[in-house]
Amino acid sequence: MESAAHHRTSSHRGDGFVGVIYGDIGPTSFRCSVVEAVERMEFVQVVHETCGTVLGRVEEIQRKTDLSLDRAQLVGDGEPVNVEERVSAQVSVIGYRDDRRLLQVPRTPFRAGEPVRRAETGTIQDVLGLTEDKKHGAYAGLLSGHDVPVYLDINAMVQKHVSILAKTGGGKSYIAGVLIEELMKHRVTCVILDPHGEYASLREKGKVAHGASRFHVEPRAYADAIQIFSPDTKINTGSRPLKFTLSNLDARDILSLTGSARVRTHLTALRKALDLLRQATKDYTIRDIIRVLEREEDPQNASLIDELEYLSEVEIFAKEGTRIDELVIKAKTTIINLKGVPPDIQELVVNRLATAMFELRKLGRIPPMMLVVEEAHNFCPQVGQIASSKIFRTLASEGRKFGLGLVVITQRAAKVDKNVLSQCNTQIILKVTNPNDLKAIISSVEGLTASMAEEISRLPIGVAIMTGGGLEMPLMVEVRPRETRHGGESVKVIED
């Protein structure tokens, strides 16, 4: 094949001009000179001779200078030194839309000397497929560096699950609040498993955040759409009591809740007590079990009775439990406030609720819904087996078939069961620095470029990498301000 020389002139400057393509050029990436300042991860556009306008993203920026070590020392001594410098950028090609509206990448290289410009809003929206679908979409924020709204498809989130991943203090509960606000606007049925009592603030109107005008968000409260239940209404005042019956628990289940180290010793006595009670009634309490054991007058039962007294004090069991159809109400959001509840009791609550919701959803007795799980590493851990591990694996693999979606929230991605995390097709990733967590995230996210993976540990507060949820590729998004009051602020030791 003969090579053909062509002349390129410098009359390309104009609005948004960045530089020109040079050097070795391919159809999927190229280098360009940088005349006007451009930032890493910024979108640019360039005209391809057969494909028309093509969108790209700046992956790397480099400044080359002729300043040697010796001359740098002169600068340090205050002597004037002339420094010549050149700035260049590596651009990865995202593509263009063909006549069928499919995203395509050119099959031939770009031409040397072709001008590179900052991408226009229309080009970004067209190529990335960012439509303002307010009917089916959750407004997450603005494309980083551009005033382009980003919407996540709600149906895709329910059908294919969501994960929100961040380091401690990275803003995961804040963005979870943003997502839940959007679900409430669209009247999606939600249940939130809230170990720290952070989400009750969704009932309260927030303050006008700095820079909120860019996002067109106004403070709002959702008190009418929310109900709150808790196993401990003494700590979590204003919550409705959450109660369970004992009828579905066998002797081994009850002993596991007591944390007893003498399971074998107590198992026979407890089974005998349960058999006696079940012959008389289906509705019995921990106090009823204690009374049966006390009547036996067996000294070996003394420690078992003490352990059952602990369960009785928790007051989570009753003759009549809370019905699931009280918790799951169409178009409403229910918060299960577990603040102050011991970890073993939290496991019981989460396991019982998640199992019941899945079974009733399969039967169509409760509406399609989202189950939001905060501190997910505590309820579906990668290492070890706890009561709720099995149901979350089942929900992750089968929940989508029955319209039960998960929102998995954690600051320790590496500690969440990989079978659960890998099933989350919509991922919202904030700043993460732990190497093990980064490895877990990168292995679970499709389409993440090497440069974007590097960016995870450098993300500023308020910026997230989002993928799935109707997005065709991972995008960096400035998260919109909350409409409601954020309930997950860190406690200040020294007040302002």
Q: How should each PLM-predicted stretch be described?
A:
Residues 99-157, 476-478, 482-483, 488-490:
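P-loop NTP-binding catalytic core
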Residues 193, 373, 409-410:
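Hydrophobic residues in beta-strands of the RecA-like P-loop NTPase core, especially within AAA+ ATPase
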Residues 2, 394-478:
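Conserved ATP-driven motor cores of ASCE-family P-loop NTPases powering translocation/secretion/packaging/pilus
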Residues 131-159, 163, 313-342:
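The Walker A/P-loop phosphate-binding site
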Residues 182, 197, 201, 207, ...:
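P-loop NTPase motor domains
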Residues 2-8, 16, 43-45, 89-96, ...:
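Phosphate-binding and hydrolysis-coupling loops of NTP-dependent motor/remodeling domains
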Residues 2-122:
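Long, basic/Gly/Ser/Thr-rich N-terminal segments
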